[in-house]
Amino acid sequence: RGLVGSQRIGEQRVPFGPSEEVIVKTALRDLTGYDRVMVYRFDPDGHGQIFAEARAAQLEPLLGHHYPASDIPQRARELYLRNRVRVLADVHYLASPLVPELRPDSGEPLDMSMCHLRSMSPLHLQYLKNMGVTGTLVASLVREGRLWGLIAAHHYSPRHLRLGLRQVVDLLAEVASTRIAAIENYAHAQVALMVQRLEQ
């Protein structure tokens, strides 16, 4: 199969470490109070899978569900890399218009990508409504500059998250991202060593 094929096998078998499971199942859900907290991992083609979940007892499990790459457009993925924690308090909010719509000095649209109060895509809002979700929290898991996955929390009524908790979530996501990189780098090294031994 060669080194590349073996590396792909190694990547598929890399687990989410025990410390990350704790972050999802205890720290994040207990800390934030959301009804459901999930971890998505993206494959090389951008498709996602939920492989860790903590939820209220009355909710149906989503663990193991797969989602097509089209559920998260490329533009949204780029924004997740720039602004790594996003909170939506109430999906039924009324957006406030930006006045003026264009920058007076350049005539260009204002870059709102780093703004926490930036409105969300109408398509995404409808997607959440279709699932019955009212409030969300999303934190990016980034490895070596690419979007590895997401920590996503759903609530079925409006939920506000104060700034201090957002910062804690950001820190926990960064810790998880560092751990993910360490686990995958170790797995890749082990696969490379195994292939080297087989080729000798």
What is each residue range found by the language model?
Residues 1, 47, 141-151:
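Short hydrophobic/glycine-rich mini-motifs in sensory/regulatory modules
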Residues 14-33, 182-200:
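Signal-transducing coiled-coil/dimerization helices and immediately adjacent hinge/linker segments
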Residues 24-33, 38-43, 52-55, 128-129:
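Short regulatory alpha-helical segment in sensory/regulatory domains of signaling proteins that mediates
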Residues 40-46, 145, 185-195:
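Short, glycine/acidic-rich hinge or "gate" loops at secondary-structure transitions
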Residues 40-102, 197:
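GAF sensory/regulatory domain recognition
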Residues 94-134:
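Signal-transducing coupling segments at domain and membrane junctions
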Residues 115-120, 148, 154-170, 180-186:
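Regulatory loop-to-helix N-cap segments in sensory/regulatory domains
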Residues 134-142:
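Short hydrophobic beta-strand micro-motif common in sensory/regulatory domains
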